[in-house]
């Protein structure tokens, strides 16, 4: 398995499985001198960790991160940052019945065919449990981006099943268990999830993430365009089946006169492009959305097959999220932060001495 790292100048490598002893990651390329401690990472990990509300999995993991290397006297040293989170609430017996069964919609079959064996306990490496380390690494990137460059990243659940946010109030996002920005829809969300959980089914979701304060110039055309790298990072999150930048698939119904973001010395009149033009950041807010499938870990019986090729019926036991989009908000923030951090360092390496005579503009 060779796809465990992301980034070129800011490199994040994760390791570990859902029911293994621990999860871990190595961060290479973080500049020295950044004030950093475990509490900086723990805040985002607590937002992602399981067992925090009745709408998510009942698995209870403290997700307490330990710094193994790369930080001395409260500051990064410029060497590799080693992080680890121990798994403490595994119940591997919940998965003994699927040892030789393939759960439809999961990675069981493809992992078996690719590697010739698989860790069936909670999905092993394919489990979203792995994303805890992405969130920890993303918190390091977020700290640097905000402290050094004034860049802030905020994510939210913009749609759960048929329920969409009509307004986006960032002050509401951390005030409810859904990370939802529209207070008027919270009761509707609660009722919907209660019925869904009772039925034993699951539902999909849409998560949005916005980065403000991003300077002009990030992105490396042609193959490492900023939007391409963001899409790559977000698409690598478990259960993501679609990524949009700016208006995304909505551009299909737009005319050129509608979609183009008119500009003047006072700034851009709109942001249909999502803050990226020609693969390079424009200085506007970067806006991305991800579509997340409903998890296949449900208690409703489904047809499948055994590892020996026999027909079988599968009922997934264990503790699972009825909507994976809820806990994906800090994960999406982390992945966007990692990409922006990497591209800031790449841009600085090549273009630090560039001095354009054209004035920078933002949103009007």
Swiss-Prot record:
GO MF annotation: an example: chorismate synthase activity
Keyword presence, Lyase: yes
One Gene Ontology cellular component: cytosol
Catalytic activity, reaction form: 5-O-(1-carboxyvinyl)-3-phosphoshikimate = chorismate + phosphate
InterPro entries per UniProt: Chorismate_synth, Chorismate_synth_AroC_sf, Chorismate_synthase_CS
Gene3D superfamilies (UniProt xref): Chorismate synthase AroC
Listed EC numbers: 4.2.3.5
UniProt-annotated binding residues for NADP(+): 48, 54
Subunit structure: Homotetramer.
Recorded family membership: Belongs to the chorismate synthase family.
Described purpose of this protein according to its UniProt entry: This reaction introduces a second double bond into the aromatic ring system.
Protein name, as recorded: Chorismate synthase
